[in-house]
């Protein structure tokens, strides 16, 4: 039996209610395996997902749907010391990042 995380898509419904991703540059902090990233990336302009865990980033990169190849990038980075210039993103997403 396969366990489905959030089969009702509650997470993405809440995110879309509070943020308009259409054409936006999005930074997802603590992107993990990319499970949530893919759900909004189709409408975003560009998504950069960062995480500290290389195993999760590897899964996110390998499992990335091919239609999102040119829109989603993953990098190992610490949210305390972001390796980006100011105002690089329009929206920041922190979901389940402790």
Can you say where each PLM-predicted feature lies in the sequence?
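Conserved alpha-helix/loop element of class I SAM-dependent methyltransferases that forms part
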Residues: 5-24
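Conserved acidic residues
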Residues: 24, 45, 90
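A short, aliphatic-rich alpha-helical micro-motif
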Residues: 20-21, 41, 86
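Class I SAM-dependent methyltransferase SAM/SAH-binding core
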Residues: 27, 33-82
